[in-house]
């Protein structure tokens, strides 16, 4: 039997597949690849910078600021942290974490009223990627830094060191919400199967958070399927989905003023769980 590689049509298809594969990059999942696309132009986010508020900050985890311990409660893994947020992350105390709705939000922090603040009190912008859980065995002002109602940021060490000296341990800060500046479109990482699909929503611009997610097949004009918030940045869809068709995703932010976008190219046809896909638009 003649080799199929002698067929010009098959050879061309294979060449195109190789060229397409060259456009994918590593993300945070086991076999994690996502389709890298350019962001489409869009309106400036209506989410505005807030006023300054009082809080406090410490640091935790690997000195590099990169690793799985910086995103567990939200659903990020190490490669997500590295590729999306670098070392500019923090675990949020319960009031800021807001049952996972605070995941992905961006804050600007500056050290105040401490001899350990770096000269000039420089600020740093971080993304909330984890929960700093309360410690009810310690008082709020002596070790229970993340106990409610405290507004506390347990930061990746490199970000904390931009604010203050390591010897401080804990410093008072002022913080404010700021619009998240992201590169590229919203990213969707998939787990589960064709009957229960779990979507990890990352790289969200503007308010940075999500309160509602719906999906529908891209080619057939079907009805929207409302996803349920699972935990952190994850949403689950209980429906039979045919992966031969791509998925369009509708997202609404959690913070006010709420904004909704439709990512028509969110997940390409023949999608596979375990991979990450990136749409072409965001909350800009």
Curated annotation (Swiss-Prot):
InterPro entries: Expan_Lol_pI, Expansin, Expansin/allergen_DPBB_dom, Expansin_CBD, Expansin_CBD_sf, RlpA-like_DPBB, RlpA-like_sf. It is found in: Secreted, Cell wall; Membrane. It is a peripheral membrane protein. The keyword Heme does not apply. Pfam families: DPBB_1, Expansin_C. Keywords: Cell wall, Cell wall biogenesis/degradation, Membrane, Secreted, Signal. One of its GO terms (cellular component) is membrane. The keyword Secreted applies. Residues 71-185 form the Expansin-like EG45 domain. PROSITE patterns: EXPANSIN_CBD, EXPANSIN_EG45. Residues 1-21 form the signal peptide. Belongs to the expansin family. Expansin A subfamily. May cause loosening and extension of plant cell walls by disrupting non-covalent bonding between cellulose microfibrils and matrix glucans. No enzymatic activity has been found. May be required for rapid internodal elongation in deepwater rice during submergence. This is Expansin-A17. The lineage of its organism: Eukaryota, Viridiplantae, Streptophyta, Embryophyta, Tracheophyta. The gene is EXPA17.
């Amino acid at each position: 039997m003649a080799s199929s590689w002698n067929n010009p049509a098959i050879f061309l298809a294979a060449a195109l597949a190789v060229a397409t594969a060259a456009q994918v990059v590593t993300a945070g999942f086991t076999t994690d690849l996502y389709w890298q696309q350019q962001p489409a132009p869009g309106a400036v986010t209506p989410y505005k910078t807030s006023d300054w508020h009082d809080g406090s900050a410490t640091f935790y985890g690997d000195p590099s600021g990169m690793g799985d311990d910086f995103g567990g409660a939200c659903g990020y893994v190490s490669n997500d942290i590295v590729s999306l947020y670098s070392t500019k992350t923090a675990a949020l105390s319960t009031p800021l974490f807001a049952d996972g709705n605070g995941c992905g939000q961006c804050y600007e922090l500056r050290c105040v009223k401490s001899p350990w603040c770096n000269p000039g009190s420089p600020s740093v912008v971080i993304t909330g990627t984890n929960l700093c859980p309360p410690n009810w065995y310690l008082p709020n002002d002596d070790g229970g830094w993340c106990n409610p109602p405290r507004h506390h940021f347990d930061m990746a060490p490199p970000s904390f060191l931009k604010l203050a000296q390591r010897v401080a341990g804990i410093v008072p800060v002022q913080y404010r919400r700021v619009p998240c500046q992201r590169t590229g479109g919203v990213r969707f990482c998939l787990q589960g199967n064709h009957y229960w699909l779990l979507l990890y929503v990352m790289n969200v611009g503007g308010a940075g958070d999500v309160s509602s997610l719906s999906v529908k097949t891209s080619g057939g004009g079907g009805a929207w399927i409302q996803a349920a918030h699972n935990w952190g940045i994850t949403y689950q869809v209980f429906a039979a989905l045919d992966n031969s068709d791509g998925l369009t995703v509708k997202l609404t932010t959690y913070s006010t003023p709420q904004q909704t976008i439709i990512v028509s190219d969110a997940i390409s046809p023949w999608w596979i769980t375990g991979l990450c896909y990136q749409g072409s638009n965001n909350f800009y």
